């Protein structure tokens, strides 16, 4: 089967159900990484994923991994308990550092290319891409970044260079996000790391229904302002 080659001049994606089954979710190629195209993609359950130097590829896998409710183990509850946790956390205080560290820490993986970093930093400046930082004193030791789509947060990548740093980031962020009216975290494709925190696979159509609901919700003003998360 063939996939659609997108024009750079027209922002238009095929419907997600047109995606291939093998490789799972491959929907289209080409286009660009402009903020307008990226936002349309995420609003329709589509995300870019490609190796540096290769054509841009767009995906919408079925099933889709989603964190509906974070599962926190007893050991992690003890680890992040106030007064015991060695880390402090912040929101949108070091986006560029987080995404560039995600890129450099993924040994053998080159999908967070220089073009991706540039595009998502632009989305951050527009208030649509966000980061969570984990600090050990003044050193950045973990973090994650993603895109906000109404009451859904579309997670892109995370990194950790200290014990439980990325797990702690996701747990702390999920608690904050849901307190502010957030509903779900899109994890795209299930892996062992997100599964242990409660992520599960749901049919793509169910995910798209959640995404539609999420876009009907407006979060309170100031939710994404740079701030300490504890």
Curated annotation (Swiss-Prot):
> According to the UniProt entry, what is the EC number of this protein?
2.3.2.6
Q: Which residues form a coiled coil?
A: none
**Which Gene Ontology MF annotations are present?**
leucyl-tRNA--protein transferase activity
Locations listed in the record = Cytoplasm
Q: Which UniProt keywords apply?
A: Acyltransferase, Cytoplasm, Transferase
The domain of life for this entry's organism is Bacteria
S-S pairs: none
Chemical reaction(s) catalysed: N-terminal L-lysyl-[protein] + L-leucyl-tRNA(Leu) = N-terminal L-leucyl-L-lysyl-[protein] + tRNA(Leu) + H(+); N-terminal L-arginyl-[protein] + L-leucyl-tRNA(Leu) = N-terminal L-leucyl-L-arginyl-[protein] + tRNA(Leu) + H(+); L-phenylalanyl-tRNA(Phe) + an N-terminal L-alpha-aminoacyl-[protein] = an N-terminal L-phenylalanyl-L-alpha-aminoacyl-[protein] + tRNA(Phe)
Alphabetical list of InterPro entries matching this protein: Acyl_CoA_acyltransferase, Leu/Phe-tRNA_Trfase, Leu/Phe-tRNA_Trfase_C, Leu/Phe-tRNA_Trfase_N
Return the GO cellular component terms, semicolon-separated.
Answer: cytoplasm
Its BP terms in the Gene Ontology are: protein catabolic process
Name the principal localization, coarsely classed.
cytoplasm
Pfam families from the UniProt entry: Leu_Phe_trans (PF03588)
- SUPFAM superfamilies (alphabetical): Acyl-CoA N-acyltransferases (Nat)
Q: Describe the function of this protein.
A: Functions in the N-end rule pathway of protein degradation where it conjugates Leu, Phe and, less efficiently, Met from aminoacyl-tRNAs to the N-termini of proteins containing an N-terminal arginine or lysine.
Q: Into which family does the record put it? A: Belongs to the L/F-transferase family.
Give the protein's recorded name. Leucyl/phenylalanyl-tRNA--protein transferase
Organism expressing this protein natively = Hamiltonella defensa subsp. Acyrthosiphon pisum (strain 5AT)
Give the gene that encodes this protein: aat
